[in-house]
Amino acid sequence: MTDNLPLRGKVALVTGAARGIGRAYALRLAKRGADVAVVDFDLHSYKDYQLEAASMRGDTVVDEIREIGMRALGFQADVTDATTLNEAVQQIVGEWGRLDIAICNAGGGVGSPEETRASIVEKDLVDVVVARNLTGTIHTCQAVAVPMKEQRSGKIVTVGSQAGHRIEDNGGYAHYGAAKAAVAKYTQYLARDLGPFGVTVNCVAPGYISTGRLAPILSAMGDAQLLDDVPLGRYGTPEDCAGVIEFLSSDLSDYVTGAIIPVDGGLTYS
């Protein structure tokens, strides 16, 4: 292991990695020496967003990882389907012999701020968001826990959101905030469960991150108004989040577990 490749010899899984923050996570781990398997319901979903497509350096993130010089596997799978997710993990371990790092990034919201206020949000929207964020995270964690418990080592990182800790002014996105808050609490339960096996479990909670998908949305919402609540005065980048993921995936965080780390420029506490 070298300073430049602290993850050499490690095997990582990143869900929701076709674009945006998840892609940044996968590429950062590969640049630090890990072999990376990616899971996404559509590995070409970046094509739906002009800024995402413009930044791609291959047909998929799998090609980008291989271009870095690391091994890569790609799975088109839905994390709400436990069976296909378990099969993917079994294939990773079967081909590469182990699984050291799991980044449970897949998720996302649906609905407008107005229609997702707590008193009126419809069950159909709640079901979709809970499945994508909470259920998908649980499926991923349970799948990767099997080989990690056998190895008696591993690093699991879940992805929450500032929405899980901070209520928007209009009370919108209640279903998403509640699901992400549940992800954070589940992380702490899992940390307690897997601690005796030498597995750490932590959660990152991004704030306003300027991805190729979100940048136009944030601008339309009003940069000045949004950034007024961010002490650092700027939107975050996927690389800002990837740096924290790198820390939680490396031996620098061996005595950190059950932590919920905001990556939001101070938004949560403003």
Curated annotation (Swiss-Prot):
Its main location: cytoplasm. Keywords: Cytoplasm, NAD, Oxidoreductase. Its EC number is 1.1.1.245. This is Cyclohexanol dehydrogenase. One of its GO terms (cellular component) is cytoplasm. Optimum pH is 8.0. Stable between pH 7.5 and 8.5. Disulfide bonds: none annotated. One of its GO terms (molecular function) is oxidoreductase activity, acting on the CH-OH group of donors, NAD or NADP as acceptor. The gene is chnA. It is an enzyme of class 1 (oxidoreductase). Catalyzes the oxidation of cyclohexanol to cyclohexanone. Can also use a broad range of other alcohols, including trans-cyclohexane-1,2-diol, trans-cyclopentane-1,2-diol, cyclopentanol, hexane-1,2-diol, ethanol, 1-propanol, 1-butanol, 1-pentanol and 1-hexanol. It comes from the Bacteria. Rapidly inactivated at temperatures above 40 degrees Celsius. Pfam families: adh_short_C2. The active site is at 176 (proton acceptor). It is found in: Cytoplasm. It catalyses: cyclohexanol + NAD(+) = cyclohexanone + NADH + H(+). Belongs to the short-chain dehydrogenases/reductases (SDR) family. Induction: Induced by cyclohexanol. SUPFAM superfamilies: NAD(P)-binding Rossmann-fold domains (SSF51735). NAD(+) binds at residues 19, 40, 78-79, 105, 176, 180, 209, 211. Homodimer. Activity is enhanced by the addition of Ba(2+) and Mg(2+), but inhibited by the addition of Al(3+), Ca(2+), Co(2+), Cu(2+), Mn(2+) and Zn(2+). InterPro entries: NAD(P)-bd_dom_sf (IPR036291), SDR_fam (IPR002347).
